[in-house]
């Protein structure tokens, strides 16, 4: 039962000890290096088929590669995507952003305001945590919106209601989070 207390002392001590032991156990296995190399080759292969989702009048995705290990958020047209060599337009370079801001940003997705999808909420995790910082981004100017929505790091669940209102589930204080640390209260946030 002690491990069920996600942030409990015993659970955290168990995690720390497992984290201390794991690298040695993994890296001394003869299969480790070949598996790591294969995984790296797959992750950075230039012939991967890019998975995409609708983004405005085109398609978008997040794409890590050898040049941008953190990835770029990019878009292309449907016609270009159908070709052997789609032409991609970078919207946000996560590696450059991380360097400029001195953070270990990991792109955790976007949510764009329908129907134009020119204003998007970008989810950025510092170091790959579940918690994200959410910032408003303009795909037309390819920049964060000055004075736009900017929520501090948290385990948020956020949706657009309209151009000036978000529906936000986050830690609003005592009694607003589950035992696992996720929000279950939703409020409207206006500009």
Where are these predicted regions, by residue range?
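Beta-propeller folds
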Residues: 1-191
């Amino acid at each position: 039962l002690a491990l069920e207390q996600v942030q409990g002392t015993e659970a955290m001590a168990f995690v720390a000890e497992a984290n201390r032991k794991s690298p040695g156990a993994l890296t001394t296995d003869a299969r480790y290096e070949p598996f790591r190399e294969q995984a790296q080759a797959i992750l950075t292969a230039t012939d991967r088929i890019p998975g995409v989702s609708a983004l405005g009048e085109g398609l978008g995705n997040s794409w890590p590669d050898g040049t941008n290990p953190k990835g770029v958020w990019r878009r292309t047209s449907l016609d270009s995507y159908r070709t052997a060599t789609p032409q991609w337009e970078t919207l946000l370079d996560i590696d450059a952003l991380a360097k400029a801001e001195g953070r270990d940003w990991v792109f955790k997705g976007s949510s764009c305001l329908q129907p134009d999808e020119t204003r998007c909420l970008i989810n950025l995790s510092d170091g790959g945590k579940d918690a994200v910082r959410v910032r408003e981004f303009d795909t037309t100017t390819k920049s964060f919106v000055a004075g736009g929505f900017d929520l501090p790091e948290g385990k948020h669940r956020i949706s657009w209601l309209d151009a000036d209102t978000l529906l936000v589930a986050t830690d609003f204080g005592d009694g607003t989070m589950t035992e696992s640390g996720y929000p279950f209260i939703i409020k409207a946030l206006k500009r």
